């Protein structure tokens, strides 16, 4: 056997046969396998790094997020989208008074949400709501007042961000009682992955730089109790 030759003799006694496997024939594929394996690891990592970051949860000890929300609210820089509370036609719970509206048990949730916004301050806030019953009822129990209803808070697949900015008054926060589709439309407009928001969730958008609004984060209805504002 020549020097340096890496042959492995595999002798098979079965039927008296002897076979030889030359490992050199596999060496040519080794580099290709290494490159392929590396690519399989690198490509998903690259896609993950380049994908838009998820919208931050402002609750559960997110001190920096809570501080940014409080500061932005005090300056009248915020747009907040509030999803209506539990809708009756998608629930087995008792309706408040209209099947197209909210459930009876959701009334307390809306009142509680309103109290949270009262703590933030409503003197420098403007309120708009979708004209659908579930949104008007939510707004009514949150703020003891209801707007006439704006169609752009229902049909929100196009120009939703532009419409929101057009209704935002400098130095005043804008509260929009709307629907999950509109919240997702806002995320899409700001190039963020869409989220599945629960009933009564609030999505906050900072307009500190009016030409470059950014999603600050969200708070689910049940998570306000964990919020700590500086």
Where are the predicted features?
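Active-site-proximal alpha-helix that buttresses catalytic centers in soluble enzyme cores
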Residues: 4-150, 156-159, 167, 183-185, ...
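Generic beta-sheet signal
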Residues: 78-79, 170-178
């Amino acid at each position: 056997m020549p020097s340096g030759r890496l042959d492995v003799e595999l002798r098979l006694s079965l039927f008296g046969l002897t076979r030889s496997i030359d490992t050199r024939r596999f060496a040519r594929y080794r580099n290709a396998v290494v490159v392929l394996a590396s690519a399989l690891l690198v490509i998903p990592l690259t896609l993950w790094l380049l994908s838009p970051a998820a919208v931050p949860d402002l609750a559960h000890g997110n001190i920096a997020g809570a501080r940014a929300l409080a500061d932005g609210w005090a300056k009248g820089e915020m747009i907040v989208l509030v999803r209506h509370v539990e809708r009756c036609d998608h629930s087995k719970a008792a309706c408040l008074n209209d099947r197209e509206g909210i459930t009876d048990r959701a009334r307390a949730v809306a009142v509680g949400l309103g109290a949270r916004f009262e703590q933030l301050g409503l003197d420098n806030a403007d309120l708009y709501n979708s004209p659908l019953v579930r949104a008007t009822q939510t707004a009514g129990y949150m703020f003891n007042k209801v707007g006439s209803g704006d169609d752009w808070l229902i049909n929100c697949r196009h120009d939703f961000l532009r419409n929101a900015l057009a209704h935002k008054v400098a130095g005043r926060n804008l509260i929009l009682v709307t629907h999950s589709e509109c919240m997702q439309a806002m995320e899409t407009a700001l190039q963020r992955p869409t989220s599945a928001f629960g009933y009564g969730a609030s999505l906050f958008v900072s307009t500190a730089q009016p030409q470059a609004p950014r999603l600050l984060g969200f708070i689910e209805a049940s998570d306000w109790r964990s919020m700590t504002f500086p």
